[in-house]
Amino acid sequence: LPEKPLVASIPIALPRPDGKPGNAVAGFVCPLETDKSDPKHRVQTINAVTSRTKKQLHGMSLKALNQFSFMGVAPLMLSQMAGIGKVIPPLFNLVVSNVVAPQKKLYLKGSELEALYPISLLFDGYALNVTIVGYSDKVAMGFVGCRAATPSLQRLAVYTGEALEELETSIFE
């Protein structure tokens, strides 16, 4: 196991606190507990951190949300613009996002949309983006990675499936 946990940047969309249409976008970082061997402990800790942070963000004004988001994004954007992204330590190791899609089945000219597969982007100096999308009764995960840092995304996808099975077994046994 690694000495320090991987840290994920998690973007989220929140209802606008001012009641206007659209979303307020924010984000936070969360340790993924990859330095711990117990998968159940990992999930419990991640759930506690994400639940607590989302609750705090839901209570913020739109101005506070914007300032909070800017504080998190500013170092990333400045390092990208100045070209020093490889010199300063990263704020996080990967991005993990969840895209909310319709839960009812969609059709186009009578043909059913069977699945949605997510794709996302990478910033310079960051090696991996994992995006999860739920549609109807299915969940799909998309992996976008830097070839030099993550040479086999296919293996990562397979290992992720195996880890999810292990996690399910440990939680529901």
PLM regions: where:
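Short proline/glycine-enriched turn/loop segments at secondary-structure junctions
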Residues: 16-19, 82-87, 119-120, 131
